[in-house]
Amino acid sequence: MSRHKSKSIPGRNLRLADQIQKDLAGLIQRELDMSRAGLITLSGVELSADYAHAKVYFTVLGAEPDAAAALLNEKAGWLHSQLYKLLHIHTVPTLRFVHDAQIARGIEMSALIDRANRPGPAADEPDEPDEPEDRR
């Protein structure tokens, strides 16, 4: 009798995370009234190694990120039960919604780069000397 070590299937984590993101986006769009939370976009899903937990990253437009996260986390149990019906896997991860601040940071960094590249007087160029005043 041979023993087999349990090895995860290469790429399964990424495929499952993508499928969870796709299914959650559809459920949120079709089934939930998220008008109080603004426009929500799911930007990624990060699964734990045992698939028991998932961090779902989102961005929001037109509302406070904390309020949107609270509303999404309030609905996490219902979304989990709906995922169980859609995904045909043994363990459906517990969902935790987290605001994705990387996009906002990227926009800020882009603005800083644009400002630094703007044509204008360089900081290391000396100013033109003032004209001598007439001393009489």
From Swiss-Prot:
It comes from the Bacteria. The keyword Cytoplasm applies. InterPro entries: KH_dom-like_a/b, RbfA, RbfA_dom_sf. One of its GO terms (cellular component) is cytosol. It is found in: Cytoplasm. It holds the Pfam family RBFA. Gene3D superfamilies: 3.30.300.20. SUPFAM superfamilies: Ribosome-binding factor A, RbfA (SSF89919). Residues 124-136 have a biased composition (Acidic residues). One of its GO terms (biological process) is maturation of SSU-rRNA. Residues 114-136 are annotated as: Disordered. Its main location: cytoplasm. The keyword Repeat does not apply. Keywords: Cytoplasm, Ribosome biogenesis. One of its GO terms (molecular function) is ribosomal small subunit binding. One of several proteins that assist in the late maturation steps of the functional core of the 30S ribosomal subunit. Associates with free 30S ribosomal subunits (but not with 30S subunits that are part of 70S ribosomes or polysomes). Required for efficient processing of 16S rRNA. May interact with the 5'-terminal helix region of 16S rRNA. Monomer. Binds 30S ribosomal subunits, but not 50S ribosomal subunits or 70S ribosomes. Belongs to the RbfA family. This is Ribosome-binding factor A. The gene is rbfA.
